[in-house]
Amino acid sequence: MPVLLLVLLALLAPGGVVAQGLPAFAPINPVAAGRTPLSYEPYRPYRPGTWALTAALSYASAIETNNIPTATYLLDSELLRVRFGVSRDLSPRTFVLADAELLGAYSGFLDGFLDWYHGLLGINIPERDRRPHDQFGYFVDLHNEAPLRGRPDDLFLGDTRLGVGVRVHPAVQSVAVVTLPTSTGPEGYGRGVVTAGLLNTAHLAVSSRLAGEGSLGLGFAPRHGTLAESQHELLASGSVGARFRLFGRQSLYGNLFYHTPYYHDTAMPSLDRYDLALDFGVLLGSDLGHEWRIGMTEDLKPSGPAVDLIFQFGGKF
């Protein structure tokens, strides 16, 4: 409902210059990212005659454990994603985009820091108490399905994404995307098939300081690989967020991202339930129009398929 309201307000708002929006966001947990073409795609104002470049680095700590007599799921890893993107306007209404990514999965080094961080906030993560520090683990054993055994890998190519966008209103856009299975990583990290999605974003400039954005996404990912029998093919996502300018070109942002379940009937809450995450941080702008992002992402649904904590860094040029 908040997303639909934001879309309606954006459609009714008078046309004009659209202010900068929120940073992009996509799931990084391999059991989620390997099953969806959906993400949060920020609104792109018209920039004639220039290429827009983006670079983003995400480093995440994931700890999820589910164990019942007939099935077991463990993900204990630190995850790296470095994404490079390019886009260009073809007309005031249409644009194209493409991005590629480098990924990594490690035993890591952050567990001690995260114990202190969660203790400071009074957050209890029992899964961390049951696991040794900085030890990699990634496997899924489901009843009547072949087991998935993920392994660490220092650096590998992820899937590639291509898209065509249309601004259907001065503050509303739709982007059709496809992902190509270009991953060179081990089993359990790439999609393995072509997937497709439609990402819709609405931007609402509330004032000179405050702007809101909401999104709705629909996607299709064919069943594939070891866990094919338990995978959903039709997927949906939504988000609602805001950006508040503090002074000059410096802003705070927050974005709540929701994704429907990626799997079904596994008896594993971390696989069968929806994904809910809060992305937040600061945006530092320059007089040249460049923008830098420093942020974090927290899992708001610990029993769902998310990660414990993501550190986010990025830039737009």
Locate predicted features.
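Residues on the lipid-exposed face of transmembrane beta-strands in outer-membrane beta-barrel proteins
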Residues: 42, 57, 82-88, 98, ...
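Transmembrane beta-barrel strands of outer-membrane/channel proteins
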Residues: 55-61, 98-102, 174-180, 214-220, ...
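Outer membrane beta-barrel transmembrane domains
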Residues: 116-148, 227-317
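Surface-exposed strand-loop-strand hairpins of Gram-negative outer-membrane beta-barrel proteins
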Residues: 23-28, 58-81, 148
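Repeated loop/turn-to-beta-strand initiation elements of outer-membrane beta-barrel proteins
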Residues: 93-98, 170-174, 208-214, 248-254, ...
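Outer-membrane pore/translocation modules
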Residues: 101-233
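Outer-membrane beta-barrel biogenesis signature
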Residues: 15-56
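Residues that define the transmembrane beta-barrel architecture of outer-membrane proteins
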Residues: 76-82, 155-160, 190-196, 230-236, ...
